[in-house]
Regions:
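Short amphipathic alpha-helical interface segments
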Residues: 33-71
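Conserved alpha-helical substructure of the radical SAM core
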Residues: 55, 73-82, 86-193, 200
């Protein structure tokens, strides 16, 4: 790179700081995270302040007392080159806002389960949501999030149950305006929402459970397939970014191209795939949502072929890490190794905070939103060690391991 040109933290990077140091997230690659040593952190902060590499070197070399050491200077510019090669820095002179606070651990991403009520009764639902459920998050809990956390959040996901069923959904959306808002929905009520509310969402994600009324009746106990399609078409016609999420079954893999064709006919520009959690209604039993290793390999091949065939729709590459069989956690202790519980939190309809939507509330949801906010303000954090140990013990009695919730969260 040219050392006499202005440099800045790259536009696609999201810088965030907390009491544990500087973190940078790559928004173009699934928010993959970069962490840094103290010296590296000081270099990046200086880049963000001065934008001139000679001045950055001057500031860092003075702080660490290396003077004009030739060896140190060579190491400095090699590291700057590495930052550039990894697209962490780029040419430019813009100061980037660094989110968070250096003396706190504020969350950066928050999922809010507005309700456990749903007009579908999906056979794989991790929350066991359905029409017979009756809990809704209170406006008081939403107000606490808005007053104490909202200004520190990069994004908020509204989910459920079916989030749009909440009787105060419109007011909640308005209260949480500020961070990037994402709606995760079954799509059946999108056609009925006000344009003003829909336009407040940066992204709307619709889960697609089948390609016909019959399949919706079988897997979601609802005949609302046409209603879902109408909602999707309305959103794409409004030019609101929309992604279709397809949880895989073996019958879906057999006919995956038909799903892509349906999405294209509705104006969808992005499709992603996932595997349902083995919890809730999908816990502990062999179901239609279980996929053999051979079938999964078949899907990975089909996914590649479809991405090559269709250039008018972003068919997201399936993350092979999702299907890789990792070494199982069999010890009595484990730790959370991702951002869950720190940069990521989930708030349930009960107003309880847990580290992530993928970690069930009956194991991890033991702290109220009020208690959580208090711990953030006092920078005491939440120690999940005992919870994890208890969960490992309970799951072992059922012949399961803790990484059955998420294969990448624990070590």
């Amino acid at each position: 790179m040219y050392i006499d040109t202005e440099v800045m933290i790259a536009e696609n990077m999201l810088p965030y700081i907390n009491s544990e140091g500087l973190h940078i997230y790559d928004r173009n690659h699934g928010f993959s995270q970069f962490v840094f040593t103290g010296v590296e952190e000081d270099i990046i902060k200086a880049v963000n302040s001065y934008h001139d590499l000679h001045e950055v070197w001057s500031q860092v070399s003075t702080k660490y007392g290396v003077g004009d050491s030739k060896k140190a200077k060579i190491s400095f510019f090699k590291y700057v080159e590495k930052l550039y090669d990894n697209h962490i820095i780029d040419y430019g002179g813009i100061d980037r806002v660094i989110m968070g606070k250096p003396d706190r651990i504020y969350p950066l991403f928050c999922s809010i389960e507005l309700t456990n009520v749903c007009n579908f009764t999906c056979s794989h639902c991790y929350k066991e949501a359905g029409p017979s459920c009756e809990e809704y998050i209170s406006l008081e809990s939403i107000r606490k999030i808005a007053d104490n956390l909202k200004n520190h959040l990069y994004s908020i996901d509204l989910t459920g149950g079916e989030a749009t069923i909440h009787p105060e959904f419109t007011e909640i959306v308005k209260m949480l305006d500020g961070p990037k808002l994402h709606l995760l929905t079954n799509g059946s009520r999108l056609a009925d929402l006000d344009n003003e509310i829909l336009k407040r969402f940066e992204i709307i994600q619709v889960s697609l459970y089948g390609k016909s009324v019959e399949e919706y009746l079988k897997f979601a106990q609802n005949i609302g397939f046409k209603k879902v399609c109408d909602g999707i078409k309305r959103v794409t016609d409004m030019k609101i970014p929309l992604v279709i999420a397809i949880n895989l079954r073996e019958d879906i893999i057999d006919d995956i191209e038909s799903y892509i064709e349906i999405c294209r006919s509705l104006g969808v520009k992005s499709v992603r795939f996932g595997i349902p959690l083995k919890s809730g209604r999908n816990d502990g039993v062999i179901t239609d949502w279980d996929i053999s290793p051979d079938k999964m390999k078949e899907f990975v091949d089909k996914n590649r072929i479809l991405r090559e065939k269709y250039n008018d729709i972003d068919i997201q590459e399936f993350n092979k890490a999702d299907i890789r069989r990792k070494k199982r956690i069999t010890k009595n202790r484990a730790t959370i190794v991702c951002g869950a519980g720190k940069t990521d939190i989930c708030v349930s309809e009960k107003g309880l905070v847990r580290p992530c939507v993928m970690l069930p509330e009956n194991y991890f949801g033991g702290i109220t939103i009020e208690e959580y906010i208090s711990k953030v303000e006092m920078n005491t954090g939440i120690d999940y060690t005992d919870v994890i140990c208890e969960t490992i013990s309970k799951l072992r009695d059922r012949g399961k391991t803790i990484d059955s919730f998420c294969e990448s969260a624990f070590a």
